[in-house]
C-alpha cells in the first residue's frame, strides 16, 4: 500500500494542539504509526499543520471523511491526503519540505463558519434549571448492566433524545430491548481510549467491523443538533457520512472535533462512575485491558 495513501496533512491547527491531542482525535479511525508537527525554530512553536500516518489506507480515508472541516480547539481544520511528490520512500527529509501544496495550505483555516458564530445550536445537556424528569416523560430511558472481567461493575442509565433525533434514538432503544430479535446484550466495549471515549455496539463481529441497525445495514445521519460538549454523551460511531448501524460510543470528555461528524442522541443520567470504570480499562491504542461486557440491557417503562 502506497505510503501517500496513509499519510494525512492536517492544517489549521491552534497553538494548543500537540501530538497527544492529535493522537486522541485520530486514533478512533485506526492504528497510527507516526505523528509529525513541524516546528518554526524562530518562534519555537509549531507551524499550524501536522502529518498523521496510519497503518492502513482505509483508516486514513475514514479519518478524512470524519475530520475534514471539523473543529479542534475552536479552529476549523483541513484534513487531506499529503502529497509529497518528490520525496522517495525511506527518505529522511520531512515531507513538507518540497511540497508546494502543503506550503499553500499550511496554517490555513476555513472562514465559512465565522458567519455562523453567535447562532450556536442547542447542546446535549439540559437547559439550566430544567429538571431531567421533564424530558424523561417524553424521551425514553434505557440501561446497561456492565461486567468488567468476571465482576459486575454497575449500571449505566441513559436518556435518549427522541425529541431531537427520533430515528437514531429508536434504533438504540430497540437494540437495548432486543424487541427486533437482536441487540446489545452480551456484546462488548471493544475500543476504549481514556480521556476520549468508550465504543461498543458491534454484536456481530465484536471488533468494530460489524453490527446492524433495526432499519437494515446502515442509515443516514439524522442531524447534528446535539454536540459533544462533555463526558457521558451518547453518540453514533460510523465509518463516514451516513453509515450508522449499531455501534455507539460514550464520551469521557469534551470531544468537540466530532461535532458535525457523529450524531449525538443521548446522555448518561446515572452511572457516570461506571463509565469511569470502563474508561480505566482502556489504553492509548484502544485495546481494553479486560473484557468489558454489556451483561444486560433494557428500557425503563
Swiss-Prot record:
- The segments labelled Disordered in the record are 107-137
Q: Which GO terms describe its biological process?
A: mRNA splicing, via spliceosome; positive regulation of viral genome replication; protein folding; regulation of DNA-templated transcription
Per the UniProt entry, the effect of residue 191 to A is: Expected to disrupt proline isomerase activity. Abolishes inhibition of KMT2A activity
Effect the entry attributes to changing residue 51 to D: Abolishes interaction with KMT2A. Abolishes inhibition of KMT2A activity
Q: Where is the RRM domain?
A: 6-84
Q: What EC number(s) does its UniProt record assign?
A: 5.2.1.8
Claim: Isomerase is one of the keywords in the record = yes
Sorted alphabetically, which Pfam families does this protein's record hold? Pro_isomerase, RRM_1
* Resulting phenotype, residue 49 to A: Strongly decreased affinity for KMT2A. Decreased affinity for RNA
Query: At which residues is Phosphoserine found?
Result: 91, 97, 119
The chemistry this enzyme catalyses reads: [protein]-peptidylproline (omega=180) = [protein]-peptidylproline (omega=0)
The record's Gene3D superfamilies line, in alphabetical order, gives:
3.30.70.330, Cyclophilin-like (2.40.100.10)
What keywords appear on the UniProt entry?
Answer: Isomerase, mRNA processing, mRNA splicing, Nucleus, Phosphoprotein, RNA-binding, Rotamase, Spliceosome
| Disulphides | none
Domain PPIase cyclophilin-type, residue spans: 143-299
Q: Its GO CC terms?
A: catalytic step 2 spliceosome; cytoplasm; cytosol; extracellular region; ficolin-1-rich granule lumen; intracellular membrane-bounded organelle; nuclear speck; nucleoplasm
Q: Mutating residue 39 to A leads to what result?
A: Decreased affinity for KMT2A
InterPro entries listed in its UniProt record? Cyclophilin-like_dom_sf, Cyclophilin-type_PPIase_CS, Cyclophilin-type_PPIase_dom, Nucleotide-bd_a/b_plait_sf, PPIE, PPIE_RRM, RBD_domain_sf, RRM_dom
Give the UniProt subcellular location, in the record's own words. Nucleus
Q: In which tissues is it expressed?
A: Found in all the examined tissues including heart, brain, placenta, lung, liver, skeletal muscle, kidney and pancreas.
EC main group: isomerase
Q: Which family does it belong to?
A: Belongs to the cyclophilin-type PPIase family. PPIase E subfamily.
Domain comment text? The RRM domain mediates both interaction with RNA and with KMT2A (via the third PHD-type zinc-finger), but has much higher affinity for the KMT2A PHD-type zinc-finger.
Record note on quaternary structure: Identified in the spliceosome C complex. Component of the XAB2 complex, a multimeric protein complex composed of XAB2, PRPF19, AQR, ZNF830, ISY1, and PPIE. Identified in a pentameric intron-binding (IB) complex composed of AQR, XAB2, ISY1, ZNF830 and PPIE that is incorporated into the spliceosome as a preassembled complex. The IB complex does not contain PRPF19. Interacts (via RNA-binding domain) with KMT2A (via the third PHD-type zinc-finger).
Describe the function of this protein. Involved in pre-mRNA splicing as component of the spliceosome. Combines RNA-binding and PPIase activities. Binds mRNA and has a preference for single-stranded RNA molecules with poly-A and poly-U stretches, suggesting it binds to the poly(A)-region in the 3'-UTR of mRNA molecules. Catalyzes the cis-trans isomerization of proline imidic peptide bonds in proteins. Inhibits KMT2A activity; this requires proline isomerase activity.
| Protein name in UniProt | Peptidyl-prolyl cis-trans isomerase E
Instruction: Show the taxonomic lineage.
Output: Eukaryota, Metazoa, Chordata, Craniata, Vertebrata
